[in-house]
Amino acid sequence: MSELPPRPRLAALQMMATYGLPQEATADKFVWHDAGPFKRINVTKAEHHHDFPLPHMDYLEHTIDYRVPADKAAALSAYDGSLTFDRTRGEMSARCDLEGHNILTLNLAHDIVTGKKDTEEARQAFGHTVVEDFKGKYPADVVTLRVDPSKKGTTYADQPVIPGSPKRAATVTDDSKKNDDAEILAFVAVVDMNEILAADQAAKEKVNPQVMQYAKKLHQEHGTNLEQTLMLGQRNGVTPILTPAVDTMRVKGATELATLVPLDGDQFGKAYLAAMIKGHTEVLAMLDTKLTDAESEAVKRHLTETRQHVTQHLEEARKLQTSMKD
């Protein structure tokens, strides 16, 4: 608390008096979760100049669950530069120096979304209400949030634009689409994506030229295989489905890559090769299992071709590992 400048410190103490101790506290900010009608409240050490509706500093932010329609995004941005929203997470935030003025910001933003006010009307209403507030009249829009911050249905996952993209299992309502081939193609796609991410990380490291060349090859070939996997699904009318098992594999890839990132130079190179040997060995075993589960001949052929590439990658990794020991 002592590290906060005077104004943010005052805001933090005011929030503590109303909502209790914050759930998060660092040298740079305090955070409250599920405080009153708000999803989140932030008080930051950083202060930013903001001249609407009159000059002040921004350091206090209130966030609610709220779905902003795409066609209202520009109007909201023009209304108040300190009003922000995240359509993916389904959130809208107001940042100012007073809680009441953040409540006002959110109330008038809701009026814009619902068509009760346009941008300029909301801006003028904001200024008028602040003047009334300064006169001690306690306008309702400064005291009470008119928005029902429902915590359901505000998120927006958007839509894929890459042809043949996998779908999350929860979004597939037609059970006939949830066949073995749909999950198998998703497994192959996730394997490719995991290898692409690992190769991309290797490209950022100072590894020896042989390891770098190997990583670039894997990046290109797994990228091509990913494209072919998605195209196959399109041709066969099978959309890859991200089942919980597929997602577990994706998380496994991230977990293993996270152990490599802190390493540098030769240490990274050796660990990367060891990970490729382990990972490709596991993928071969998975492909053998999926070959027996596949329903269409086209998917079986693709798995066989993928297996050939994975086998080659495994052999090259083993040779590189041996050469680095010599």
What label would you give each PLM region?
Residues M1-K29, D34-K39, E47-T173:
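Non-cytosolic coordination micro-motifs
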Residues V43:
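Catalytic domains of cell-wall/extracellular-matrix polysaccharide-remodeling enzymes
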Residues A170-D326:
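His/Met- and acidic-residue-enriched segments that coordinate or traffic transition-metal cofactors
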